[in-house]
Amino acid sequence: MSGSAPSIPNLLTLRGRIGGGGVTRGRYRGVIHRGGRGHGPGAPSASAAHDATIQGTDTDAAVSRLSAVQIGYIDDPYAELFAQSGPGAARRLPIINRGTYARTTAIDKLVDKFLDDTESSPEGRQIVSLGAGTDTRSLRLFSPSAPTPRKRVIYHEIDFPAMCEKKQRIVCSAPQLRSILSDPDSVEELSQHGGGNSWHSKAVAEKHKGSELWVHGLDLRAIAASQQPQQPLPPGVPIGSRGLHASPFTPGSTTQHEEQTEETSLPQQREPLTLTSLNPNLPTLIISECCLCYLPPSTASSIVSFFTTTIQSSLSIVIYEPIKPDDAFGKMMVSNLAAREIRMPTLEVYKEAEDQERRLREAGFSGGEGKGIGGARSKTIEQIWEEWTSQEEKERVDALEGLDEVEEWKLLAGHYIVVWGWRGVGVDLEI
């Protein structure tokens, strides 16, 4: 994708400037937050091309992560394994590096809180990352040098089969990962749902005894379809052929697609969907970093519903998405999308922080009789920087490369949010 192609500005891969007196279009790179997880509706004829485009955006996300690592914002010794090398390839603008830092540390904070709360769970606990791509959180978590032992953590990642195969190839070929994960084993699952290239590995370090990584090659909309009434497939269309496609945060496009109803765009399933080793009786955390926002609201809700109905233990969720589409900056984002015939359907419904919190409460993250404690909270990236980052840490980050575009930072960071919810006894993500 050309660097001049119009797309939504993003806290990871922005390659331009926001005008000092107002918002200007600028020059932005195609964007995605992590991995090939942008999933929008598409016709079967365009499926393969769009899937390939989305999967390619993982490279850009990995380079953005590496930029923050190389400059010193975050510590991730595995980032370079997943980023293509080249002179100056990893350098991002300070405003983007700070966004990468704030988002990464915020989600890490919530993940750590969940794991701390569930440390005493006798059978373990599990994390499910939607559209994980080549994200390195599981590697950092299971690293021998990780600051905290994390025993009995079952970590699930779900993404396109090709993305899962790519990650397996890197894990198998990188000597430095041998101290983290055992040799991956192929997992035969989900063939009736269009899945493939699933694999499994175990954490090697004794301090993480009993922890495992399960990588599921699966079109996320198959999960949504499993929650929908079954409808017949059109003649000649194989199960799972309606893949997940490009999104506002990917350099893919949906120009070939006509508007479709949510019902006709969902992959239809012939058997109930199950994820190998997903234990309904374990405390569970779901992570969606700019994944669900590219789906129709009912599809995104069905994916969440799959987990709220499947998991019988305590359940938590962390979502990272853009908000505020109706102000000047938000309208520019939406306009950039429309120029490429791409929509973010959930952004049209969950426009503000209170909408995102209500979304989680309506999904069941509110406690109540028979459910124990629960709640839904949110912070913009700007609030996370101001409220969750210590003064000492702010000074350290400022010293790395400085930030001249303070107002630009506030504008951009105010349009991204981390929203999280929890339900059930034994987990409290009140921060």
Curated annotation (Swiss-Prot):
GO MF entry, a single one: protein C-terminal leucine carboxyl O-methyltransferase activity
Alphabetized InterPro entries for the sequence: LCMT1, Ppm1/Ppm2/Tcmp, SAM-dependent_MTases_sf
UniProt keyword Transferase, yes or no: yes
UniProt-listed Enzyme Commission number(s): 2.1.1.233
Region feature Disordered, mapped onto this chain: 228-268
GO biological process, one term: methylation
Binding site for S-adenosyl-L-methionine: R103, G131, D159, D219, L220, E289
Catalyzed reactions per annotation: [phosphatase 2A protein]-C-terminal L-leucine + S-adenosyl-L-methionine = [phosphatase 2A protein]-C-terminal L-leucine methyl ester + S-adenosyl-L-homocysteine
UniProt keyword S-adenosyl-L-methionine, yes or no: yes
Transmembrane segments: none
Keyword terms, alphabetized: Methyltransferase, S-adenosyl-L-methionine, Transferase
Protein's job: Methylates the carboxyl group of the C-terminal leucine residue of protein phosphatase 2A catalytic subunits to form alpha-leucine ester residues.
Family to which the UniProt record says this protein belongs: Belongs to the methyltransferase superfamily. LCMT family.
Name recorded for this polypeptide: Leucine carboxyl methyltransferase 1
Source organism per UniProt: Neurospora crassa (strain ATCC 24698 / 74-OR23-1A / CBS 708.71 / DSM 1257 / FGSC 987)
Gene symbol of the encoding locus: ppm-1
